[in-house]
Amino acid sequence: YVSVTGISNVTGIINPINEVAKLAHHYGAYIVVDAAQMAAHVPIHMSGHADTAMDLDALIFSGHKTYAPGSPGVVIARKDLIGKIEPEEVGGGMVDRVLPERYYVTNDFPDREEAGTPNILGAITLGTAIHVLDQIGMDNILEEDTQLTHYCLEEMLNIPKVVIYGETCMTTCPRAGTISFNIKQLNHGLVAAILNDYFNIAVRNECFCAHPYVEKMLELTHRIQIYKARAKNITNWHTEPWMGMVRVSFGIYNTESDVDHFIHALKDIISKQD
């Protein structure tokens, strides 16, 4: 199978998942999409394409990135595929019969994949969040998100000491929801702390659970540091203070005035850098 990220949680770049699916199916592979960063930002079409080769076989996303903290993760998959796989978890509700020497897994879905006591409150929270997103309309959310991301990118590109990671031309590489950056000669952790403590702007910093990708992109801006660390054969150089970025993200509640406040904060930090 082929596993692909729907949207990078580092750069916000949107991958053409249905085109990737067509290519995977051409070579006899299944397509599994990690939509954790995608589900709250972009309309997703798993099936119904005129060319069925563009349909997705499986899609996974996390409720906590879909405005539902404390909610369960979600797996959407073709029943004929998941039915061939032994369930990962065992417990109440996923068996038809239990004997001293073995048990019989039920063929009922989704019961066989939801062993034990379900996260009822989390499921209700997630269902409500998805309902709200559906009422707003994912096409509307993507349009607003795209405008906000483009506006922020254009403003950041006008600040000389700001380094943005990933292609910044949204015509070449569409983006949604996320921009990762660094300020030259400033540690990412310090920038994140200043934004939080002095400007009331919550950002994420470091490697965003994507260490290999972040490391590869940092080669563009931290080549000397990485070379020295590798030359010294330092095994834990990924913990060095320069190893990371700052990530700013947008939600359905953000506006251009939030971007203006963020840009002002960056300029203020840089003006007082010395």
Task: Set out the residue ranges of the language-model regions.
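Pyridoxal 5′-phosphate
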Residues: 1-274
